[in-house]
Amino acid sequence: MAIKQQQNMFIKKIETWWVRRNKCLFDDKRKGKSAMDWDVLVLKLTTDTGIEGIATALAARSGNVTEAYIMDNIAPVVLGRSPFDREKIWHELWNIDRHLTFFPVYLPGPIDVALWDICAKAAGLPLYQYLGAYREQLPVYASGLFHPTEQEYIDEALYYKSKGIKCYKVHPCGPCEMDMQIHQHLRDAVGDDFMLMSDPVAEYTLDEAIRVGRQLERLNYVWLEEPFRDFELYKYTQLCEALDLPIAATETTRGCHWGVAQVINQKAADIVRADVSWKCGITGTMKIAHLAESFGMNCEIHTTTMNYMDIVNLHVSCAIRNCKWFEYFVPEEDFQFPMKGWLPIDENGIITVPKQPGVGVELDWDVIENNCVSYKKLEDQLA
């Protein structure tokens, strides 16, 4: 494709497929009374030159909500625009967010991902190189779901240890006393040479978090993650002061890098978290990573719960210096859909970034069509 044609290309068409996964990954306590189908919305942007940008979006509580936001609020901002105007589009979406759109945390990130995918493909480069490569591989840690019994956590950790993975993150089921038993017995089961992390998903009081954190220090855990809701900054600051154990936070912090900046300013985390789904795409995640780097902090990239978008996470992780791990959500078969193939993890627990242009992996369009609940399309009327 001629350089001038690339420079002048524009977004001609936006398509979405709301796709059923037929899974509910949370227990009744966390699911609550509303529906919790773990659905996915597949998004495709097509340029006038035929280059396609692909992303997936959460549709967990209601695919109607995700679909409507994209088609009613985001599409008018993007249609007819150059995909190279990502930064301008990104800020325009923040403008309409404030003026009574109020996007959910998982939007508008996927649109940004699709724009980056187009531009990397146009350049003929894998996404991580288009961003500016730092590395090609990362060690993974297996990150499990909630389990009702202690033995299930132990079995899961031992299984992934046997697969060559060097670290496991437990999402303990609660209450606090049960979590502490799980922490101890996990360490006993996997031995001292295997790394462990804990993420109770905002279940603790400050006193409980300090008590658990001191236990994790004795057991040589890597970090304690999200013991409180991410907006409880006073509690996080107190916890960071009380413990030597690193505290990881900001997974759900609103306001992208502006929100994370307040956390860093109040010394309310030792490690910040971001991902391309919940932190406004690649553009937002890179801003957070560079912000954290300025303060000597790691930005550990968080799973999107969708393998395709986690490959995008991998590209970002390979384009920044201050990320040590790739979060590998398990069991993988629950998160693969609708991506073709498995995550490229070797027998030593190392994941390698794809080398094809753009994101570099494919979706299974037959599976998407066969499980599609709703399909929508908008085209630029001036095309």
Residue ranges and their predicted role:
Residues 14, 46-122:
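Metal- or metallocofactor-binding catalytic centers and their adjacent structured scaffolds
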Residues 103, 112-147:
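Glycine-rich, aromatic-flanked loop segments that form ligand/cofactor-binding clefts
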Residues 214, 220, 231-350:
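Shared catalytic-loop signature of beta/alpha-barrel
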Residues 11, 50, 74, 111, ...:
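Conserved, mostly hydrophobic/aromatic
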Residues 133-243:
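Metal-dependent enolase-superfamily TIM-barrel catalytic cores that perform enediolate-based chemistry
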